[in-house]
């Protein structure tokens, strides 16, 4: 990692400290606050239902009809990410964490009661502060160029690995209580979710998801 940080420091004008590396276990995720007040309810902005029902629909007969038939839930998809602080880097005398992430997205298909792998992504990413783009112009272009330079380095070629992308993160809005590393981890979390959406889109495009072959996703895709 020292050689990689040397390249990043040189290209972005920062100073690497080669500090202690460790893994982050979790990041606090947004959640709903539930209570026992029956008058309160959550109103979704967007509904995925194509047919609007004003009352409950009795599915007893449909459930009986489906007994013994092939399950319509054929695909199962989930994603995971592990994040690590790999260094500290300074810009304008302010120190920022450098976060690395391992993102994995997997999908299995159930055929005749047996599970088999259908599709899998394994991606390595880095998250750097937005200030590493000194000009502040077109972050997407700048960080895409830095990713290419990193992947061309002999260090990465020897290891046989490459980074999928570099994700810029902004300092937390709450400078007093917010943690800088949480901003970087959140970017990697968002990248994982977008990768899940990408896989679903590929399955749809290939015609694998339909009324007879549903996909079950662990967690939200929004």
Regions found by a protein language model. Give the residues of each.
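Short acidic, low-complexity segments enriched in Ser/Thr/Gly/Pro
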Residues: 129-180
């Amino acid at each position: 990692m020292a050689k990689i940080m040397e390249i990043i420091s040189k290209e972005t004008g920062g100073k690497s400290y080669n500090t202690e590396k460790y893994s982050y276990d979790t990041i606090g995720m947004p959640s709903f606050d539930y209570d026992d007040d029956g008058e309160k309810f959550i109103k979704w902005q967007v509904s995925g239902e194509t047919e609007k029902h004003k009352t409950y629909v009795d599915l007893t007969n449909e459930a009986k009809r489906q007994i013994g038939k092939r399950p319509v839930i054929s695909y199962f998809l989930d994603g995971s990410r592990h994040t690590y602080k790999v260094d500290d880097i300074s810009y304008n005398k302010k120190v920022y964490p450098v976060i690395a992430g391992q993102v994995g997205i997997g999908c299995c298909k159930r055929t005749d009661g047996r599970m088999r792998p259908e599709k899998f992504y394994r991606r390595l990413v880095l998250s750097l502060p937005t200030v590493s783009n000194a000009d502040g112009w077109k972050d997407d272009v700048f960080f895409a160029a830095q990713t290419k330079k990193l992947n061309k380095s002999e260090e990465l070629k020897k290891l046989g690995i490459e980074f999928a992308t570099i994700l810029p993160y902004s300092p937390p809005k709450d400078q007093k209580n917010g943690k800088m590393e949480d901003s970087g981890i959140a970017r990697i979390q968002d990248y994982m979710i977008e990768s899940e959406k990408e896989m679903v889109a590929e399955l749809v495009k290939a015609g694998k998801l339909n009324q007879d072959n549903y996909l079950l996703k662990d967690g939200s895709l929004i």
